Regions:
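Heptad-repeat coiled-coil segments of the DHp/HisKA dimerization-phosphoacceptor module
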Residues: 103-104, 152
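Adenine nucleotide phosphate-binding catalytic loops in nucleotide-utilizing enzymes
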Residues: 78, 116-211
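Phosphate-binding loop of NTP-binding sites
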Residues: 1-102, 108-119, 173, 182
């Protein structure tokens, strides 16, 4: 949301309103003059994301991760990947853009699902060298800030932000992939995210005595 807000009025999911109740509420509360909407969709069983995607009809859909978090409802991580790929089912197969984390172990499985869905536009992000938007490196600076380096189709992108948990730097790559998919200027997103501060209780910098 922070990045897209640099380009226009942006509406986003609140809290963990990402299920069959939260997504409709988020959509229903969207102002008429919204230019960009960031709708988080979660699932705990097969079929849930399919219904949510057909309700939201996203222009761009992003899979950030596939893990064993919902394994109680599935037989394998591959089945979880199949269920997560339902997020593409509500999209226009010619105009919609599917974005996938290149680093996940089920990446090829996701591509198979995307191919079966008929999606024509697929983009990637991650640390691997062939990712469309690549998280290249991070460096802690003397003033307790963090320099993050990314590459977008070979073009360097760098920003300096307050210290954050390492996994968020990877999430930023996914957000930059959305910016790229929408054909927006990444410099505006970089400037917007430079002032990012994690939520209270997350990513706080604590100084302790040695030993």
């Amino acid at each position: 949301k922070i990045m897209l807000s640099a380009y226009g009025k942006t509406h986003a999911s609140h809290g963990n309103f990402n299920n069959y109740l939260g997504v409709p509420l988020c959509l229903a509360s969207m102002p008429n003059d919204t230019e960009y909407a960031v709708i988080e969709m979660g699932m705990s069983a097969k079929g849930e994301l399919s219904e949510l995607s057909k309700l939201a009809i996203p222009d761009v859909a992003l899979i950030t991760a596939v893990s064993e978090g919902h394994i109680e409802s599935f037989n394998s991580v591959e089945e979880i990947a199949d269920a997560k790929c339902e997020i593409f089912e509500g999209m226009d197969i010619n105009e919609g853009i599917a974005i996938v984390n290149r680093d996940i172990t089920t990446y090829e499985r996701c591509l198979q699902n995307i191919d079966r869905a008929g999606m024509q536009n697929v983009q990637t992000f991650g640390k691997k060298v062939d990712a469309g938007v690549r998280f290249v490196s991070s460096e802690i600076l003397e003033d307790d800030t963090l320099r993050l380096s990314y590459s977008t189709d070979g073009e360097a992108l760098e920003l300096v932000i307050p210290l954050i948990p390492a996994h968020l730097a990877g999430h930023f790559a996914g957000a930059f992939a959305v910016v790229k998919a929408l054909k927006l200027d990444p410099d505006a997103a970089s400037a917007a995210i430079s002032s990012f501060i994690p939520l209270i209780g997350r990513g706080a910098l604590l100084k302790v005595k040695n030993g």
